Amino acid sequence: MAVGKNKRLSKGKKGLKKRVVDPFSKKEWYDIKAPSTFKNRNVGKTLVNRSAGLKSASDTLKGRVVEACLADLQGSEDHSFRKIKLRVDEVQGKNLLTNIHGMDFTTDKYRSMVRKWQTLIEAQVTVKTSDEYVIRVFAIAFTRKQPNQVKKTCYAQSSHIRAIRKVFSEILTREVQNSTLAQFTSKLIPEVINKEMENATKDIFPLQNVHVRKVKLLKQPKFDLGSLMALHGEGSDETGKKVSGFKDEILETV
């Protein structure tokens, strides 16, 4: 074994302690605000490093995606199985104005619906909203027994599945094309589209647990501050009142 100096050992004076720096001393808190589509707009808080030199805190925050439970945003436990994704688009003081970035089911809710003796039917469409957002919508449904059915299973044939998928795609395409992203999200909260899809397919095969399972944002238009402020209820479409113009008076004599 060679004996020599170990360069990795740092020489230090005895009695000196290493200075402990609090990592939170260089950070600051920001409040996350949800769009006015939801009842509770206070989502929570987030941390970011303070602006220093060429690094700006607002640039770091823009584009940050947070996830919130719809039950917290609506104040009702009936929506606890839905997760809403919000994207930070603008920084105003200590407030972060967000826009809708997507929606999904919780894993436990999705797994609890999958059972034996029934058929799982899924459909998806890629559509552009009226405000130029390209989204992909996923729908899910399960077959159920017919009234007074004795047979244990309720499997659907391939022709039934294709017909149900076609109806789902037509309804979702129509609803998305005729709505903005915020309007389409507001339709998902009371589950209006789910009931429409279930009623439209009851003549093909009886269904249960019909849901819009997921909404994925694929492409967004160019950022517009006015539309974001209107989404948060801070903008106005009023252009103002018309005022009478000033007319020059012509003097008869000079």
UniProtKB/Swiss-Prot annotation:
Pfam families: Ribosomal_S3Ae. PROSITE patterns: RIBOSOMAL_S3AE. One of its GO terms (cellular component) is cytosolic small ribosomal subunit. Transmembrane segments: none annotated. It is found in: Cytoplasm. This is Small ribosomal subunit protein eS1. The gene is RPS1. Its main location: cytoplasm. GO terms for biological process: translation. The keyword Acetylation applies. The modification N-acetylalanine is found at A2. Belongs to the eukaryotic ribosomal protein eS1 family. GO terms for molecular function: structural constituent of ribosome. It comes from Zygosaccharomyces rouxii (strain ATCC 2623 / CBS 732 / NBRC 1130 / NCYC 568 / NRRL Y-229). Keywords: Acetylation, Cytoplasm, Ribonucleoprotein, Ribosomal protein. HAMAP family: Ribosomal_eS1_euk. Component of the small ribosomal subunit. Mature ribosomes consist of a small (40S) and a large (60S) subunit. The 40S subunit contains about 33 different proteins and 1 molecule of RNA (18S). The 60S subunit contains about 49 different proteins and 3 molecules of RNA (25S, 5.8S and 5S).
